[in-house]
């Protein structure tokens, strides 16, 4: 089964917890803090594996959770960083954040990697909090939570040339003639329902990859006839070969077919019209084909170069392949997404903290609910089993302006304040 779009969940590993410990060697006067830091959580890393062709494996495993870092230890020993979780994907995979729609990665070459969910940093041990006024702190941090998100994987096949046209115009037959590919061929519409790839070699030893794409119909740009699934595979091609049935056996007008398909390409993605297009008049071995071709030429004018062929008899196929190979050599690749500067790639992993850093709402029972990335992360990294950590968290809340904001909302002594699933009393 050919699977070209899936939704999965990924989570980076949490950082290891820091430790509260002290030196106890008899030859070390007054000891001192010796709690080590936790190790960094593992990242979820996507890596391109050229042997894969579809996203089929993700239908059976949709959750990927990386390991957390090792906890800190006594004697100042830091926890070990966990090994990254490597997830193999086929070439041509585009990774998109489901919530924001942001393109996280466009993976095309074998061995290419991208960090999709970063692991959290390790929590600091008590040796990190020692000061002149507090030489033996009873405080350590929990590890930072790993990044988690739902992502959409889309596979857009890697091909130099894409065959487009209405169903049953002879695209699959043409691919089978010019390459070793063996797509399914039959006398009914939508015989081809998945892209088929074939390596084409010309008479002068040039080669390129050609994709036979499922037939398009009017409204494909809006998803009619699975149009979105079919059109996405055209985006990576450098040259579009537009195959038109000149026989007239389907009862359609070749010129109307030509206009309709080009409109679908334009409506789906305007940049598709920037690619050079080769118009192929197929089925020229049929009785009325020559007459239909002349009428077609009169309507499109001399600006459109047309290659009359018969995929069955191979008439005109050689000249067509030479023209396609020439266009590939002179046509640069078309980036399908805006690629961020390499120095800015870290931006994709950062939470946008501009503006409001927390939000206070009130439930029907009077409970104040505090939410926001910064406060929730700080809450998760606090070890509430230690009084000193609790006091530090209270200072952090004041530093963020939460206490003042609660008073402005009318909070009084004894009111219930909720962060995540935990409740505590507000003390003014």
From Swiss-Prot:
One GO BP annotation of this record: ribosome biogenesis
Domain OCT, residue spans: 350-428
UniProtKB keywords: Cytoplasm, GTP-binding, Hydrolase, Magnesium, Metal-binding, Nucleotide-binding
GO cellular component: cytoplasm
Domain OBG-type G per the UniProt entry, residue ranges: 159-329
Gene3D superfamilies with a match to the protein in the record: GTP-binding protein OBG, C-terminal domain, GTP1/OBG domain, P-loop containing nucleotide triphosphate hydrolases
Chief site of localization: cytoplasm
Residue ranges annotated for the Obg domain, each copy included: 1-158
Annotated binding of GTP, by residue: 165-172, 190-194, 212-215, 282-285, 310-312
Compartment(s) of residence: Cytoplasm
Molecular function per GO: GTP binding; GTPase activity; magnesium ion binding
EC annotation from Swiss-Prot or TrEMBL: 3.6.5.-
HAMAP family: GTPase_Obg (MF_01454)
Summary of subunit composition and partner proteins: Monomer.
Annotated family: Belongs to the TRAFAC class OBG-HflX-like GTPase superfamily. OBG GTPase family.
Function text: An essential GTPase which binds GTP, GDP and possibly (p)ppGpp with moderate affinity, with high nucleotide exchange rates and a fairly low GTP hydrolysis rate. Plays a role in control of the cell cycle, stress response, ribosome biogenesis and in those bacteria that undergo differentiation, in morphogenesis control.
Protein known as: GTPase Obg
Organism: Bacillus cereus (strain ATCC 14579 / DSM 31 / CCUG 7414 / JCM 2152 / NBRC 15305 / NCIMB 9373 / NCTC 2599 / NRRL B-3711)
Gene that this polypeptide is encoded by: obg
């Amino acid at each position: 089964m050919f699977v070209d779009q899936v939704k999965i969940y990924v989570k980076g590993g949490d950082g290891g917890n820091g430790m509260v410990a002290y030196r106890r060697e008899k030859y070390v006067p007054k000891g001192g803090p010796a709690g080590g830091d936790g190790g960094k959580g593992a990242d979820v890393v996507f890596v391109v594996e050229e042997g894969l062709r579809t996203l089929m494996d993700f239908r059976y495993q949709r959750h990927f959770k990386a390991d957390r870092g090792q906890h800190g230890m006594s004697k100042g020993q830091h926890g070990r960083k966990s090994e990254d979780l490597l997830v193999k994907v086929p070439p041509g995979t585009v990774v998109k954040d489901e919530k924001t729609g942001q393109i996280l990665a466009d993976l095309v070459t074998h061995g290419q990697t991208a960090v999709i969910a970063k692991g959290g940093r390790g929590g600091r041990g008590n040796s990190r909090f020692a000061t002149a006024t507090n030489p033996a702190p009873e405080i350590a941090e929990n590890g930072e939570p790993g990044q988690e998100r739902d992502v959409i994987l889309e596979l857009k096949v890697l091909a130099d040339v894409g065959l487009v046209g209405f169903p049953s115009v002879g695209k699959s037959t043409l691919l089978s003639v010019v390459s070793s590919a063996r797509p399914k061929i039959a006398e009914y519409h939508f015989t081809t329902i998945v892209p088929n790839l074939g390596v084409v070699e010309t008479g002068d030893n040039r080669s390129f990859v050609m994709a036979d794409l499922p037939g398009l119909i009017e409204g494909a740009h809006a998803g009619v006839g699975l149009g979105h699934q079919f059109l996405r595979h055209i985006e990576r091609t450098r040259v579009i070969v537009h195959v038109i049935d000149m026989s007239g056996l389907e009862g359609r007008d070749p010129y109307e077919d030509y206009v309709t398909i080009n409109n679908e390409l334009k409506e789906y993605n305007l940049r598709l019209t920037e690619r050079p297009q080769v118009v192929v008049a197929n089925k020229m071995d049929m009785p009325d084909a020559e007459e239909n071709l002349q009428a077609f030429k009169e309507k499109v004018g001399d600006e459109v170069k047309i290659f009359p062929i018969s995929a069955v008899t191979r008439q005109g196929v050689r000249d067509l392949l030479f023209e396609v190979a020439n266009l590939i050599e002179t046509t640069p690749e078309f980036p399908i997404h805006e690629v961020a500067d390499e120095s800015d790639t870290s931006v994709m992993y950062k939470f946008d903290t501009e503006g409001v850093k927390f939000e206070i709402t009130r439930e029907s029972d009077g409970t104040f609910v505090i939410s926001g990335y910064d406060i929730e992360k700080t809450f998760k990294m606090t070890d509430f089993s230690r009084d000193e950590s609790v006091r530090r968290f209270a200072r952090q809340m004041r530093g963020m302006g939460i206490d003042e904001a609660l008073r402005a909302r009318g909070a009084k002594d004894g009111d219930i304040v909720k962060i995540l699933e935990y409740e505590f009393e507000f003390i003014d």
